[in-house]
Amino acid sequence: VNLGKHPLVNSLISKKNLKKKDPLFPLHVKQCKSCKLVQLAEVIDANEIYKKIEYLYFSSDMPNLDKYFKLYADDIKKRFLKKNDFVLEIGSNDGVMLQFFKKSYKILGVDPSTNVVIRALKRGIATLPEFFTKKLSKQISKEWGKAKVIYGNNCIAHLNDLKYFLLHFRFLIAGQLFWDSDFDSK
């Protein structure tokens, strides 16, 4: 489905830049016949979305999301973790879910948006302002060890190569991998 060209989501224009034109990007949507995942046909350079603009979505600003994340984290702790296990979140945003592991576990977040990571760091959540790459996964494994739990929330929609992304986990995983996504697996 071709929906034309649009400015990036979350790229609000300041008053001083109102006369400047927003860059436009193609919005063409496709669906995988096999798994039914809906995704963009043209990939926008991730730097355009996460590095060149102030990313505006903060998980901590979403009403009741922390309650959901607490329930989710409590379930993971009960079923899979022992004290001091390493927990890694990819696309951790400002650390809302990681805060529920902070007391008894070694935690690390990875998120490419620097302004979001600054908020996580202010909350005492160790977070790397990076894209999750093969190089970074090896670095984390070397410096932090293997993760007992790796998870992400609503990140799949932001990936341009899911298979390549998932391959990076082989360097890090020592336990469970969780991915919270918004598509029906039926």
Name these PLM-found stretches.
Residues 83-93:
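Conserved class I S-adenosyl-L-methionine
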Residues 8, 177-186:
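Short, glycine-/aromatic-enriched active-site segment of Class I SAM-dependent methyltransferases
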Residues 113-115:
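Conserved SAM/SAH-binding beta-strand->alpha-helix loop
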Residues 148-151:
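A conserved beta-strand element that flanks and buttresses the S-adenosyl-L-methionine
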Residues 123-139:
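Conserved SAM-binding strand-loop segment of SAM-dependent methyltransferases
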Residues 1-63:
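N-terminal juxtadomain amphipathic helix
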Residues 94-105:
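Conserved SAM-binding loop of SAM-dependent methyltransferases across substrates and taxa
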Residues 163-178:
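A short glycine-rich, Lys/Arg-flanked "PGG" loop and its adjoining helix->strand segment in the class I
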